[in-house]
Design a protein with these regions (language model features):
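Short, solvent-exposed coil/turn elements at secondary-structure transition points
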Residues: 58, 178-180, 221, 242
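SAM/dcSAM-binding transferase cores
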Residues: 2-20, 222-331
Length: 331
Protein backbone atom coordinates (compact mmCIF):
# COMPACT_ATOMS: atom_id res chain seq x y z
CA UNK A 1 0.00 0.00 0.00
CA UNK A 2 1.41 3.41 -1.01
CA UNK A 3 1.84 6.33 1.36
CA UNK A 4 -1.05 8.03 -0.40
CA UNK A 5 -3.26 4.98 0.15
CA UNK A 6 -2.25 4.81 3.79
CA UNK A 7 -3.11 8.46 4.26
CA UNK A 8 -6.49 8.01 2.61
CA UNK A 9 -7.22 4.96 4.75
CA UNK A 10 -6.31 6.85 7.95
CA UNK A 11 -8.52 9.76 6.93
CA UNK A 12 -11.47 7.49 6.21
CA UNK A 13 -10.98 5.71 9.53
CA UNK A 14 -10.88 9.07 11.33
CA UNK A 15 -14.18 9.99 9.70
CA UNK A 16 -15.71 6.69 10.83
CA UNK A 17 -14.41 7.33 14.37
CA UNK A 18 -15.85 10.86 14.45
CA UNK A 19 -19.26 9.64 13.30
CA UNK A 20 -19.24 6.75 15.77
CA UNK A 21 -18.21 9.07 18.62
CA UNK A 22 -21.03 11.48 17.76
CA UNK A 23 -23.49 8.57 17.73
CA UNK A 24 -22.27 7.45 21.17
CA UNK A 25 -22.70 10.96 22.57
CA UNK A 26 -26.24 11.08 21.18
CA UNK A 27 -26.99 7.69 22.75
CA UNK A 28 -25.73 8.84 26.16
CA UNK A 29 -27.70 12.07 25.72
CA UNK A 30 -30.85 10.03 25.25
CA UNK A 31 -30.12 7.99 28.39
CA UNK A 32 -30.08 11.14 30.52
CA UNK A 33 -26.78 10.12 32.14
CA UNK A 34 -25.36 13.64 32.26
CA UNK A 35 -28.60 15.59 32.57
CA UNK A 36 -27.48 16.96 35.96
CA UNK A 37 -24.06 18.10 34.67
CA UNK A 38 -24.06 18.48 30.87
CA UNK A 39 -20.48 19.77 30.83
CA UNK A 40 -19.47 16.10 30.55
CA UNK A 41 -21.06 15.96 27.10
CA UNK A 42 -18.22 18.07 25.73
CA UNK A 43 -15.61 15.74 27.23
CA UNK A 44 -17.16 12.63 25.70
CA UNK A 45 -17.52 14.42 22.36
CA UNK A 46 -13.85 15.43 22.39
CA UNK A 47 -11.94 12.44 23.80
CA UNK A 48 -11.30 9.74 21.14
CA UNK A 49 -12.07 6.42 22.86
CA UNK A 50 -10.60 4.36 20.00
CA UNK A 51 -7.11 5.68 20.82
CA UNK A 52 -7.44 4.08 24.27
CA UNK A 53 -8.41 0.65 22.95
CA UNK A 54 -5.92 -0.15 20.15
CA UNK A 55 -7.18 -3.68 20.61
CA UNK A 56 -9.93 -5.29 22.65
CA UNK A 57 -11.72 -8.61 22.98
CA UNK A 58 -15.32 -9.45 22.25
CA UNK A 59 -17.01 -12.59 23.51
CA UNK A 60 -17.70 -15.29 20.95
CA UNK A 61 -18.76 -18.91 21.21
CA UNK A 62 -15.88 -20.74 22.87
CA UNK A 63 -13.94 -17.70 24.06
CA UNK A 64 -12.90 -14.27 22.81
CA UNK A 65 -12.19 -12.64 19.47
CA UNK A 66 -9.49 -9.96 19.27
CA UNK A 67 -10.20 -6.77 17.36
CA UNK A 68 -7.33 -4.39 16.69
CA UNK A 69 -6.65 -1.21 14.80
CA UNK A 70 -3.59 -2.48 12.95
CA UNK A 71 -5.36 -5.32 11.17
CA UNK A 72 -4.35 -5.56 7.49
CA UNK A 73 -8.03 -5.94 6.61
CA UNK A 74 -9.77 -2.54 6.13
CA UNK A 75 -13.15 -4.04 7.03
CA UNK A 76 -11.68 -5.42 10.28
CA UNK A 77 -10.23 -2.00 11.13
CA UNK A 78 -13.62 -0.41 10.60
CA UNK A 79 -15.25 -3.02 12.86
CA UNK A 80 -12.62 -2.23 15.47
CA UNK A 81 -13.23 1.53 15.41
CA UNK A 82 -17.01 1.21 15.37
CA UNK A 83 -16.86 -1.27 18.25
CA UNK A 84 -14.69 1.14 20.24
CA UNK A 85 -17.67 3.50 20.41
CA UNK A 86 -20.28 0.93 21.34
CA UNK A 87 -21.91 1.67 24.69
CA UNK A 88 -20.58 -1.51 26.24
CA UNK A 89 -17.58 -2.44 28.40
CA UNK A 90 -14.60 -3.62 26.35
CA UNK A 91 -12.27 -6.33 27.65
CA UNK A 92 -8.72 -5.11 27.11
CA UNK A 93 -6.55 -7.53 29.11
CA UNK A 94 -6.99 -11.22 29.77
CA UNK A 95 -4.84 -13.75 31.59
CA UNK A 96 -5.75 -17.44 31.38
CA UNK A 97 -9.30 -16.44 30.52
CA UNK A 98 -9.57 -14.06 33.52
CA UNK A 99 -10.46 -10.43 32.87
CA UNK A 100 -7.71 -8.17 34.25
CA UNK A 101 -8.65 -4.82 32.78
CA UNK A 102 -11.39 -3.27 30.73
CA UNK A 103 -12.73 -0.01 29.38
CA UNK A 104 -15.99 0.54 31.22
CA UNK A 105 -19.37 1.12 29.59
CA UNK A 106 -19.36 4.80 28.52
CA UNK A 107 -22.89 5.59 29.75
CA UNK A 108 -22.03 4.15 33.18
CA UNK A 109 -18.81 6.18 33.21
CA UNK A 110 -20.83 9.30 32.35
CA UNK A 111 -23.25 8.63 35.19
CA UNK A 112 -20.38 8.04 37.63
CA UNK A 113 -18.54 11.20 36.59
CA UNK A 114 -21.71 13.25 37.05
CA UNK A 115 -22.27 11.63 40.47
CA UNK A 116 -18.68 12.51 41.45
CA UNK A 117 -19.78 16.18 41.41
CA UNK A 118 -16.46 17.49 40.11
CA UNK A 119 -15.91 21.24 40.43
CA UNK A 120 -13.37 23.48 38.71
CA UNK A 121 -9.98 23.25 40.39
CA UNK A 122 -10.67 19.92 42.12
CA UNK A 123 -7.79 17.51 42.56
CA UNK A 124 -9.02 14.06 41.53
CA UNK A 125 -7.59 10.60 42.21
CA UNK A 126 -8.74 7.72 40.03
CA UNK A 127 -8.24 4.19 41.37
CA UNK A 128 -7.80 1.85 38.40
CA UNK A 129 -6.11 3.48 35.42
CA UNK A 130 -7.35 0.89 32.95
CA UNK A 131 -6.91 2.19 29.42
CA UNK A 132 -6.55 5.81 30.54
CA UNK A 133 -9.84 6.88 28.95
CA UNK A 134 -11.53 7.94 32.19
CA UNK A 135 -8.46 9.94 33.23
CA UNK A 136 -8.58 11.70 29.85
CA UNK A 137 -12.24 12.61 30.39
CA UNK A 138 -11.37 14.03 33.81
CA UNK A 139 -8.37 15.95 32.44
CA UNK A 140 -10.52 17.40 29.66
CA UNK A 141 -13.26 18.43 32.08
CA UNK A 142 -10.84 20.08 34.52
CA UNK A 143 -8.66 21.64 31.83
CA UNK A 144 -5.48 20.91 33.78
CA UNK A 145 -3.64 17.59 33.52
CA UNK A 146 -1.90 18.12 36.86
CA UNK A 147 -5.22 18.00 38.72
CA UNK A 148 -5.73 14.34 37.75
CA UNK A 149 -3.86 11.35 39.19
CA UNK A 150 -4.60 7.77 38.18
CA UNK A 151 -3.09 4.64 39.75
CA UNK A 152 -2.99 0.96 38.84
CA UNK A 153 -1.17 -2.07 40.22
CA UNK A 154 0.20 -3.50 36.96
CA UNK A 155 3.16 -1.69 35.33
CA UNK A 156 2.12 -2.79 31.85
CA UNK A 157 -1.34 -1.30 32.42
CA UNK A 158 0.00 2.05 33.61
CA UNK A 159 2.55 2.22 30.80
CA UNK A 160 -0.04 1.55 28.12
CA UNK A 161 -2.45 4.03 29.76
CA UNK A 162 0.31 6.66 29.69
CA UNK A 163 0.91 5.99 25.99
CA UNK A 164 -2.80 6.14 25.15
CA UNK A 165 -3.18 9.41 27.04
CA UNK A 166 -0.21 10.97 25.27
CA UNK A 167 -1.53 9.86 21.88
CA UNK A 168 -4.80 11.65 22.66
CA UNK A 169 -3.01 14.77 23.90
CA UNK A 170 -3.45 14.34 27.67
CA UNK A 171 -0.77 14.06 30.36
CA UNK A 172 -2.26 13.44 33.81
CA UNK A 173 -0.05 11.83 36.45
CA UNK A 174 -0.05 8.03 36.05
CA UNK A 175 1.26 6.05 39.03
CA UNK A 176 2.06 2.35 39.40
CA UNK A 177 1.04 1.11 42.83
CA UNK A 178 -1.61 -0.49 45.04
CA UNK A 179 -4.73 1.62 44.67
CA UNK A 180 -5.87 0.64 48.18
CA UNK A 181 -2.97 2.74 49.51
CA UNK A 182 -3.90 5.75 47.41
CA UNK A 183 -1.16 8.10 46.22
CA UNK A 184 -0.08 10.05 49.32
CA UNK A 185 2.59 12.04 47.49
CA UNK A 186 -0.14 13.61 45.32
CA UNK A 187 -2.58 14.32 48.17
CA UNK A 188 -4.74 16.03 49.27
CA UNK A 189 -7.63 15.18 46.95
CA UNK A 190 -11.07 16.71 46.57
CA UNK A 191 -12.52 13.71 44.75
CA UNK A 192 -11.67 10.01 44.55
CA UNK A 193 -13.29 7.75 41.97
CA UNK A 194 -12.67 4.01 41.73
CA UNK A 195 -13.27 1.86 38.67
CA UNK A 196 -12.70 -1.43 40.48
CA UNK A 197 -14.90 -3.22 43.01
CA UNK A 198 -14.12 -2.91 46.73
CA UNK A 199 -15.10 -4.98 49.76
CA UNK A 200 -14.60 -2.03 52.11
CA UNK A 201 -13.34 1.56 51.97
CA UNK A 202 -9.55 1.83 52.35
CA UNK A 203 -8.73 4.11 55.27
CA UNK A 204 -5.77 5.54 53.35
CA UNK A 205 -8.20 7.22 50.99
CA UNK A 206 -9.87 9.19 53.78
CA UNK A 207 -6.49 10.30 55.10
CA UNK A 208 -5.62 11.66 51.64
CA UNK A 209 -8.87 13.62 51.26
CA UNK A 210 -9.62 17.20 52.14
CA UNK A 211 -12.57 17.67 54.53
CA UNK A 212 -15.71 17.77 52.42
CA UNK A 213 -14.23 15.55 49.72
CA UNK A 214 -16.35 13.03 47.85
CA UNK A 215 -15.54 9.38 47.17
CA UNK A 216 -17.40 7.35 44.54
CA UNK A 217 -16.62 3.65 44.37
CA UNK A 218 -18.13 0.31 43.33
CA UNK A 219 -18.84 -1.86 46.37
CA UNK A 220 -20.78 -5.12 46.40
CA UNK A 221 -22.66 -4.65 43.11
CA UNK A 222 -23.50 -0.99 43.64
CA UNK A 223 -21.94 2.47 43.71
CA UNK A 224 -21.38 4.14 47.06
CA UNK A 225 -21.06 7.95 47.25
CA UNK A 226 -19.34 9.03 50.46
CA UNK A 227 -18.95 12.49 51.93
CA UNK A 228 -15.63 12.71 53.81
CA UNK A 229 -15.77 14.61 57.09
CA UNK A 230 -12.15 14.09 58.08
CA UNK A 231 -9.39 11.46 57.99
CA UNK A 232 -11.44 9.02 60.08
CA UNK A 233 -15.06 9.68 59.16
CA UNK A 234 -17.14 9.35 56.01
CA UNK A 235 -20.72 8.45 55.24
CA UNK A 236 -23.05 8.13 52.29
CA UNK A 237 -25.67 6.16 50.40
CA UNK A 238 -25.61 3.90 47.38
CA UNK A 239 -26.75 5.19 44.02
CA UNK A 240 -29.66 3.48 42.30
CA UNK A 241 -27.67 1.85 39.52
CA UNK A 242 -26.02 -1.60 39.53
CA UNK A 243 -22.29 -1.69 38.84
CA UNK A 244 -20.02 -4.62 38.05
CA UNK A 245 -16.29 -3.99 37.88
CA UNK A 246 -13.07 -5.97 38.06
CA UNK A 247 -12.11 -6.38 41.77
CA UNK A 248 -9.41 -4.17 43.28
CA UNK A 249 -6.19 -6.17 43.20
CA UNK A 250 -3.34 -5.94 45.67
CA UNK A 251 -1.19 -7.96 48.00
CA UNK A 252 -3.73 -7.77 50.83
CA UNK A 253 -6.91 -8.33 48.80
CA UNK A 254 -8.58 -11.72 48.62
CA UNK A 255 -11.77 -12.87 46.97
CA UNK A 256 -14.69 -13.79 49.24
CA UNK A 257 -16.26 -17.20 49.00
CA UNK A 258 -19.45 -17.43 46.98
CA UNK A 259 -22.64 -17.56 49.01
CA UNK A 260 -24.45 -20.90 49.05
CA UNK A 261 -28.00 -20.23 47.86
CA UNK A 262 -29.52 -23.70 48.15
CA UNK A 263 -32.99 -23.67 49.67
CA UNK A 264 -33.80 -20.10 48.64
CA UNK A 265 -36.68 -19.43 46.22
CA UNK A 266 -35.60 -19.16 42.60
CA UNK A 267 -37.00 -15.66 42.27
CA UNK A 268 -34.74 -14.49 45.10
CA UNK A 269 -31.66 -16.26 43.74
CA UNK A 270 -32.22 -14.56 40.38
CA UNK A 271 -33.12 -11.13 41.74
CA UNK A 272 -30.38 -8.57 41.18
CA UNK A 273 -31.29 -6.53 44.28
CA UNK A 274 -31.25 -9.59 46.52
CA UNK A 275 -27.82 -10.51 45.20
CA UNK A 276 -26.68 -6.98 46.02
CA UNK A 277 -27.82 -7.50 49.62
CA UNK A 278 -25.97 -10.82 49.74
CA UNK A 279 -22.77 -9.20 48.51
CA UNK A 280 -23.10 -6.30 50.93
CA UNK A 281 -23.75 -8.46 54.01
CA UNK A 282 -21.43 -11.38 53.20
CA UNK A 283 -19.76 -12.47 56.42
CA UNK A 284 -22.48 -10.86 58.57
CA UNK A 285 -25.69 -12.51 57.37
CA UNK A 286 -26.15 -15.97 55.96
CA UNK A 287 -28.33 -16.15 52.81
CA UNK A 288 -31.42 -17.33 54.70
CA UNK A 289 -31.20 -14.42 57.14
CA UNK A 290 -30.67 -12.03 54.24
CA UNK A 291 -33.73 -13.42 52.48
CA UNK A 292 -35.95 -12.95 55.54
CA UNK A 293 -34.77 -9.35 55.89
CA UNK A 294 -35.21 -8.68 52.17
CA UNK A 295 -38.81 -9.85 52.22
CA UNK A 296 -39.64 -8.15 55.51
CA UNK A 297 -38.37 -4.77 54.29
CA UNK A 298 -40.16 -4.90 50.94
CA UNK A 299 -37.20 -5.88 48.74
CA UNK A 300 -35.30 -2.60 49.23
CA UNK A 301 -33.77 -0.63 46.38
CA UNK A 302 -30.08 0.26 46.55
CA UNK A 303 -30.72 3.87 47.59
CA UNK A 304 -31.99 2.68 50.98
CA UNK A 305 -28.56 1.26 51.84
CA UNK A 306 -25.52 3.20 52.95
CA UNK A 307 -22.07 2.94 54.52
CA UNK A 308 -20.50 4.69 57.49
CA UNK A 309 -16.77 4.82 58.27
CA UNK A 310 -15.84 5.88 61.78
CA UNK A 311 -12.28 5.33 62.95
CA UNK A 312 -11.46 1.63 62.76
CA UNK A 313 -15.10 0.69 62.28
CA UNK A 314 -17.03 0.47 59.05
CA UNK A 315 -20.55 -0.75 58.56
CA UNK A 316 -23.30 -0.98 55.98
CA UNK A 317 -26.84 -0.11 56.96
CA UNK A 318 -30.42 0.00 55.76
CA UNK A 319 -32.31 3.32 55.94
CA UNK A 320 -30.48 4.80 58.93
CA UNK A 321 -26.81 4.59 60.08
CA UNK A 322 -28.06 4.26 63.66
CA UNK A 323 -31.06 2.10 62.80
CA UNK A 324 -31.95 -1.53 63.40
CA UNK A 325 -30.07 -2.97 60.45
CA UNK A 326 -26.29 -2.61 60.37
CA UNK A 327 -23.56 -5.01 59.24
CA UNK A 328 -19.83 -4.75 59.74
CA UNK A 329 -17.70 -4.59 56.61
CA UNK A 330 -14.25 -6.19 56.46
CA UNK A 331 -11.53 -3.83 57.61
Amino acid sequence: MSAQDLGRDAEELADVAAAARAALVSEIDASGAWADDPVWREAFAAVPRHLFVPYYYVGVVGGYERRWGQSPDPAARERWVRGAYADIPLATRLRDGELLSSSSQPSLMAMMLVALEVEDGNRVLEIGAGTGYNAALLAHRLGDDDLVTTVDLEPDITESARQHLAAAGYHPVVVTGDGARGVPERAPFDRIIATCTLRSIPRAWLAQCRPGARILAPLATGLIALAVRDAEHAEGRFLHTPAYFVPLRGATRSEPERAQLGGLPRRARDDELFRFLLALTRGSLDPQEAYVLWEREGQPQRERYGITVSGEHEWAWLDDPEGAYAWALPG
